[in-house]
Design a protein with these regions (language model features):
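Glycan-recognition and catalytic cores of secretory/periplasmic carbohydrate-active enzymes
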Residues: 1-191
Length: 191
């Protein structure tokens, strides 16, 4: 639910119908922006787009301050659809540029030959990071972003393919730290 006083979405409500957080997580905010941007970019229903537009306009300013990679990636994936319909929105273009650079800079700082990744660990919804960077690299005509995204995505796909050929996401009981062992169980449903 959107909190107009903070300009952020909240995610956790208790059984007593009270919010468990005053502001809301950046993950929840990024996911909400992704959903709203997809509605704005794809929906043919004017009423639905009007409702999404009001929330999107109120919620977007918070995205310019994102420093966490996953909320940035969620927002970027949504902005790809949004800018497909509204390519002249300078504020959205600026936010896309800043968040795409955030991802690319994280990759450049951390990636190594044996660890072509954005962070020193793999945790949850990992594929969204290269997904977002790939979309941005293609739409912004930035080959460096495309190359980094494809290197990371290829490595992740190999890493998360079990011996039998099936998908085996990183478990959340310890995740997978560089030079460590990947957690093979207790995967999250979001994967």
């Amino acid at each position: 639910a959107f909190n107009p006083q903070t300009g952020r979405f909240r995610n956790f409500m208790g059984f007593d119908r009270r919010w468990q957080e005053a502001i809301g997580s950046v993950d929840a905010h990024g996911r909400a922006l992704w959903a709203l941007a997809v509605v704005l970019g794809r929906s043919r229903r004017e009423g639905l787009r009007r409702a999404a537009s009001r929330l999107f306009e109120m919620a977007m300013p918070a995205a310019s301050g994102f420093t966490d990679l996953r909320p940035a990636a969620y927002t970027l994936i949504g902005l790809h659809d949004y800018l497909g319909r509204y390519p002249g929105d300078r504020a959205a273009q600026d936010t896309r540029g800043r968040l795409a650079e955030l991802l690319l800079d994280a990759y450049k700082r951390t990636a190594a030959e044996n660890w072509p990744w954005f962070e020193p660990r793999l945790s949850y919804v990992n594929a969204r990071l290269p997904h977002a960077l790939l979309l941005c690299g293609e739409s912004m005509r930035r080959p460096e972003m495309v190359d980094a995204a494809l290197a990371a995505l290829g490595w992740l796909a190999r890493l998360q393919t079990a011996d039998g050929g099936h998908f085996a996401p990183i478990g959340n009981d310890g995740f997978y730290h560089c030079n460590g062992q990947p957690a093979r169980f207790d995967q999250q449903p979001i994967e």
